Amino acid sequence: CTSVCPVKIPSADVALQLRAFLDEEGAGGHPLKSKVLNWLVRDPAHRIPQAVKAAALGQRMQNRIIGVVPQAIKKRLYNPLFSGKGPEPGYRNLYEALHLERGNIFVPRSGDGAPVQENTALKEAVLYFPGCGGSLLSRTIGLSALGLLLRTGVAVILPEAHLCCGYPLLSSGADAQFASNMARNKKALQATIAGATKRGFRVTHIVTACGSCREGIERLEPSTLLGEGGGQLVHLDVMQ
């Protein structure tokens, strides 16, 4: 999107800076928000999936309750949370659906249906970063992205554990927590790429499927993930 400001003020960056300033001054919103974010960011690989499962159960219960509320009462409820049924996040996430504890590298099948063997014909691979949307909130996004990538004929590597891009932290003004999460992500992605390299794959691209993850990965500077002399890691959206 082009800038709407005639004097080219980066409105989005200014908004994030103002958000961080308000948070530093103790005016960033309800104190519970900060406590929840601080709790999640200390162990995002385990706590964010747990929180999404709890949210899925809560939404499922709310939808059942809303279903028996008389229409006359619903019309009085202006809050969309209570005026009708809401979308239910998937309870089973991408990591559970794919059983990533068994392996995080997926290779396309050859023309005769036999899997392509590692360290032979297939060398090029892409690193897919599903984020929270494609792995926790709607695993069908992640599964669809994985299927599309495999159809291009390249191997697909996923992080072994859940990684959050951290952009919700940035947009909430939690700059310090965002920086900490970004450093953790960088270390995990470098280890993932190194593990794939040892198994004979050459990672050439990092792929995202959501706008906030796109921004979070760009701030991570993908070119630094391969290390010195490792080449250039190209960042693309999955539909590109």
Language-model features and meaning:
Residues L225-Q240:
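Short, flexible loop segments at boundaries between secondary-structure elements
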Residues C1-C164, P168-L225:
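Iron-sulfur-cluster electron-transfer modules
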